[in-house]
Design a protein with these regions (language model features):
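Catalytic nucleophile loop
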Residues: 103-120
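Non-globular targeting/processing and membrane-anchoring segments
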Residues: 1-105, 122-128, 132, 138-254
Length: 254
């Protein structure tokens, strides 16, 4: 016998209609927040960031691929990783279906990581992806946009991420928390090396030959980009998580 509340169809409908009003309010608030994102002031980018792409060396403006808007997913794949972050990989599984639609709405979607291009290409082939993915190896891009931190920064006890200073334990290795060490092992490294990268997304606009930064989000801010969680939040048991359960799509038994 289930422990969950059981009701009649009429009781379900009454509760569902009450929830529907809350969902509608959330949608209205989401629309308002989307407009506030668009209303943020733009910040001019004068630094000459360089990237390696499948087409060759590229500037930030080149990543727009002839369009006026650029969305970059900061994919956690550091130079010392042997594979991409499994969480970022789960998010990226949804990119290919969106790329063509965005491209036909004047928006380019691109992933950027610090790993050398050859590593990104090999992993991209393994995952069966086709979306654009650029390497920012030897560039300040990831650090400047808050998704790369040195071991020295972590050892200082304070790291700037997600628009705040994070208080961290300099001696933390990940061994104290098996979950953290398990995630690090999944990319072939240890926790201090793994956490030098961080997830996030940034938006840019190109106007009159000038690139402007318009928006960035990190941590739970990328939840909305993680397709499987949008489905799980509507499943009977929700996220129902216990530890590091997700894998790359080619690592499941089914």
């Amino acid at each position: 016998m289930t422990d969950h509340k059981i009701g009649t169809r009429d009781e379900w409908l009454a509760a569902r209609l009450e929830l529907l009003e809350a969902e509608k309010e959330l949608t209205r608030r989401s629309d308002e927040l989307a407009q506030r994102r668009q209303d943020l002031p733009w910040v001019r980018i004068d630094k000459d960031y360089r990237f390696d792409t499948e087409e060759g060396a590229a500037s930030l403006a080149d990543l727009f691929s002839g369009r006026s808007q650029l969305l970059i997913y900061h994919f956690m794949f550091g130079p010392d990783y042997t594979a991409g972050c499994p969480s970022c990989s789960a998010i990226a599984d949804g990119f290919d279906g969106s790329v063509v639609h965005l491209a036909n709405h004047d928006v380019t979607l691109c992933a950027v990581s610090r790993a050398p291009l050859a590593k990104l290409q090999a992993y991209k082939q393994r995952m069966g992806w086709s979306f654009p993915w650029a390497s920012s190896y030897d560039s300040d891009f990831n650090h400047d946009f808050g998704v790369a931190h040195t071991k020295e920064e972590w050892q200082s006890g304070a790291v700037e991420y997600n628009f705040r200073t994070m208080d961290v334990a300099p001696s933390e290795t990940g061994e104290e928390i098996p979950f953290l060490n398990q995630i690090a092992s999944s990319v072939g490294t240890d926790w201090p090396t793994y956490r030098q990268e961080g997830p996030g997304m940034s938006a840019f606009v190109l106007e009159d030959g000038v690139v402007y930064h318009t928006y960035s989000t990190y941590e739970r801010g990328v939840d909305a980009l993680w397709g499987m969680y949008q489905w799980l939040d509507r499943a009977p048991l929700g996220r129902n998580e216990s530890g590091f359960w997700w894998r790359r799509h080619d690592e499941y038994d089914l």
